[in-house]
Amino acid sequence: MNFLNFSILIFAYLLGSINSAIIVCYIFRLPSPRSVGSGNPGTTNVLRIGGKVPAAITLIFDILKGLVPVVIAKVLTGNEFITACTALYAILGHIFPIFFGFKGGKGIATLVGTLFGFSWILGLIFVITWLCVAIITRYSSLSALVATFIASFSVIFTSDLQVAAPFLIIAIIILVKHKGNIQRLISGQESKIGDKAKAKNDSN
């Protein structure tokens, strides 16, 4: 691995480590997303805590955290594998941020950015899948999980297995991060889209 590739991966991780949910809630003088609602510093919890505007800002920044480094890797290296690894590092930064004690969000919005940066078709697959599942079930977590796996496995059909591997690793990490959501989905206790923040309970 040359210096350029290494630098891009480090940049992706550090950018991913900037937790926009925590920063946005601080700017809007809202409770910390780590102590209210689900306790998850992500877009869905910010929506429950502060409404549409703070959530939209959080969503946009989280998407850009994935999009920007992947596009940079794509343009500067022209290497699909390095670009896919850049996506993985951006997700790792978001989920395990060095600036916030390695306790971050669940990576969905940042994944959307990486997918659009890697291939707009993959990004579109994610968005369409998420919307379809969300409209039918109103479960944000279920929509995210289904869309994540469909989009990640779709990489296999557009690139070789080596390139797809980082996205499959991302899917597994996101699945593990949603363990609590999966348990509540099974028990029928998972929060639905539109539910207001209550006591901290680890939902998405």
From Swiss-Prot:
Its main location: membrane. GO terms for cellular component: plasma membrane. It catalyses: an acyl phosphate + sn-glycerol 3-phosphate = a 1-acyl-sn-glycero-3-phosphate + phosphate. InterPro entries: G3P_acylTferase_PlsY. Keywords: Cell inner membrane, Cell membrane, Lipid biosynthesis, Lipid metabolism, Membrane, Phospholipid biosynthesis, Phospholipid metabolism, Transferase, Transmembrane, Transmembrane helix. The chain crosses the membrane at residues 8-28, 53-73, 81-101, 116-136, 155-175. The keyword Lipid biosynthesis applies. One of its GO terms (molecular function) is acyl-phosphate glycerol-3-phosphate acyltransferase activity. It is a multi-pass membrane protein. Belongs to the PlsY family. Probably interacts with PlsX. This is Glycerol-3-phosphate acyltransferase.
